[in-house]
């Protein structure tokens, strides 16, 4: 009798183990399938983003937010960048998402309302806040460039090299305007969740303009408001691959 009960218990344990292993296998297959779907979705979103941002912009629709060629100021050279987002942590690195899909900048996760400061002294090339601070979702193409939501791009000089630095997905609290000079560490905006965004963060891109003069850079941006500085939105022209300036820098090189 006792032996029969033990056999039954052993059989039940074996059956339960087999069922558990089967459930684990199914869960693993579902996770793998989900990850593939996420990767494909990220790739599609990145491709659509590149297409939308490559489209010719109607300058009359954004002229009020773009620096004028009448700017004749100088930019103080500083010895290095400082961290622009005053809190939070890195959530996605540059060139590609961990789950797949092109990603051309550094994502810094921080609560909506976190201070964003000028990483170096410079001048604001573009600043606009057309949408709500926490209005972002994937596939939301509001703002300029498309999907950027509330955005800023500034020009700065670090150790004699001219850089353009972009900030996307900001809140509506933007404290600067095009043509305004700013000092390193000055608060220029608050972080948000606007445009093509899955959560509160600031997307940062850095462009190395080499020995381009401030006046030439201002004139070039004023003419076409090209946030990508001729590098496009498909991932080419990176500085680390040896491309000549203007080229895309990996923001992690300066901000960590």
Task: For the regions a language model picked out, list residue spans one by one.
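Extracellular/periplasmic catalytic domains that process cell-envelope and extracellular macromolecules
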Residues: 84, 99-100, 116-117, 144-146, ...
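Short, charged beta-turn/beta-strand-edge "cap" motif at the junction between a beta-strand
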Residues: 130-132, 188-196
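Terminal peptide-recognition signature
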Residues: 108, 122, 185, 203, ...
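Domain-scale macromolecular recognition modules
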Residues: 74-123, 127
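A structural signal for short beta-strand/turn segments enriched in small hydrophobics and glycine
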Residues: 116, 122-124, 179-191
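Acidic, glycine-rich catalytic/binding loops that coordinate metals and/or anionic ligands
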Residues: 177-180, 205-256
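Zn2+-dependent peptidoglycan hydrolase active-site motif and core
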Residues: 118-172, 178, 199-208
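Alpha-helical oligomerization segments with coiled-coil/rod-like character
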Residues: 1-77
């Amino acid at each position: 009798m006792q032996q029969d009960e033990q056999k039954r218990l052993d059989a039940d344990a074996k059956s339960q183990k087999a069922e558990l292993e089967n459930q684990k296998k199914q869960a693993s297959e579902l996770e793998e399938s989900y990850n593939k779907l996420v990767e494909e979705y990220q790739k599609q979103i990145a491709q659509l983003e590149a297409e939308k941002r490559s489209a010719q912009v109607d300058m009359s629709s954004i002229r009020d937010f773009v620096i004028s060629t009448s700017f004749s100021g100088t930019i103080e050279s500083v010895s290095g960048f400082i961290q622009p987002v005053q809190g939070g942590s890195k959530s996605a690195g540059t060139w590609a998402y961990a789950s797949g899909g092109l990603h051309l900048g550094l994502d810094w996760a921080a609560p909506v309302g976190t201070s964003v400061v000028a990483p170096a002294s410079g001048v604001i090339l573009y600043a606009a806040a057309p949408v709500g601070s926490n209005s972002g979702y994937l596939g939301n193409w509001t703002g300029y460039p498309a999907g950027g939501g509330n955005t800023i791009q500034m020009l700065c000089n670090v150790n004699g090299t001219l850089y353009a630095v972009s900030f996307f997905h900001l809140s509506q609290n933007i404290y600067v305007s095009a043509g305004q000079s700013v000092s390193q560490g000055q608060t220029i905006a608050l972080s948000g969740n606007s445009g093509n965004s899955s959560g509160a963060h600031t997307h940062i891109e850095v462009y190395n303009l080499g020995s381009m003069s401030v006046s030439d850079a201002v004139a070039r941006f004023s003419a076409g408001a090209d946030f990508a500085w001729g590098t496009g939105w498909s991932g080419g022209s990176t500085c680390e691959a040896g491309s000549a300036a203007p080229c895309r820098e990996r923001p992690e090189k300066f901000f960590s």
